[in-house]
Design a protein with these regions (language model features):
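Short, small-residue-biased leader/transition segments that mark boundaries at the very start
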Residues: 3-8
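Short secondary-structure boundary segments
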Residues: 1-2, 111-113
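Catalytic core of non-heme Fe(II) oxygenases with the double-stranded beta-helix
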Residues: 10-89, 97-99, 105-109, 116, ...
Length: 125
């Protein structure tokens, strides 16, 4: 019989995001992706809060998930101002981006991809 197992096939990686750095819109391989917010300085949330009523401003320090398959017009998005301790798990093919911030701080995150694999098993229940 075949069993499904979830595994982290690639090594997790640590991101050190500094002032003015960003991750462009992208997707990952695998079935699920995850990001753990290890250290998100409060300055990033304060910076994001100062522009929330200005619709023509970017989203400093925010993580955005963009719905819709790659190559098509997207149907919507979800933006979040992450904080230390947040964990996000999402479909690996979900487009997402991380916006830059201008505060002189470093945000530390850990990311990894999860693969759903099938394995043969001789065990019987």
């Amino acid at each position: 019989r075949r069993q499904r197992q979830m595994c982290i096939r690639d090594s997790p990686w640590i991101n050190f995001q500094k002032k003015n750095e960003f991750n462009p819109v992208h997707v990952h391989g695998g079935d699920l992706s995850s990001v753990i917010m290890i250290d998100v300085p409060e300055e990033i949330a304060k910076e994001s809060d100062t522009v929330k009523d200005k619709t023509n401003m970017p989203c400093p320090g925010q993580l955005e998930f963009i719905e819709g398959p790659s190559g098509y017009m997207y149907t919507g998005s979800y933006k979040v101002v992450p904080k230390t301790g947040d964990i996000f798990v999402f479909p690996a093919q979900l487009k997402h981006t991380v916006y830059p911030f201008t505060s002189d701080v470093t945000r530390i995150t850990m990311s990894y991809n999860i693969f759903n694999i099938q394995v043969d098993s001789n065990t019987q229940e």
